[in-house]
Amino acid sequence: MSHAVKIYDTCIGCTQCVRACPLDVLEMVPWDGCKAAQIASSPRTEDCVGCKRCETACPTDFLSIRVYLGDETTRSMGLAY
């Protein structure tokens, strides 16, 4: 089952989520929106197993990265009709 990985613009570019992911789903890409000049990206979401280690590793109080498991994806992201 595929899971959606959403990275919010509150990301501080710390790389904690990238290092926590056991399947290398995430990577850092250039971004001018924070001091670190980088943001997490999820180019390989098809490999995500939904362990949410990236969420646990995120040091921001508002979880800059979220994993939405299967059916909760559209509902949680506000895409359901």
Swiss-Prot record:
Cofactor list: [4Fe-4S] cluster
Binding-site residues for [4Fe-4S] cluster 2, renumbered to this chain: C21, C48, C51, C54
InterPro entries tied to this protein: 4Fe4S_Fe-S-bd, 4Fe4S_Fe_S_CS, PSI_iron-sulfur_center, PSI_PsaC
EC number(s) stated in the UniProt entry for this protein: 1.97.1.12
GO biological process: photosynthetic electron transport in photosystem I
GO terms assigned for molecular function: 4 iron, 4 sulfur cluster binding; electron transfer activity; metal ion binding; oxidoreductase activity
Residues that span the membrane, as ranges: none
Localization terms from the record: Cellular thylakoid membrane
PANTHER family attached to this UniProt entry: PHOTOSYSTEM I IRON-SULFUR CENTER, PHOTOSYSTEM I IRON-SULFUR CENTER-RELATED
Protein name: Photosystem I iron-sulfur center
Gene, per the UniProt record: psaC
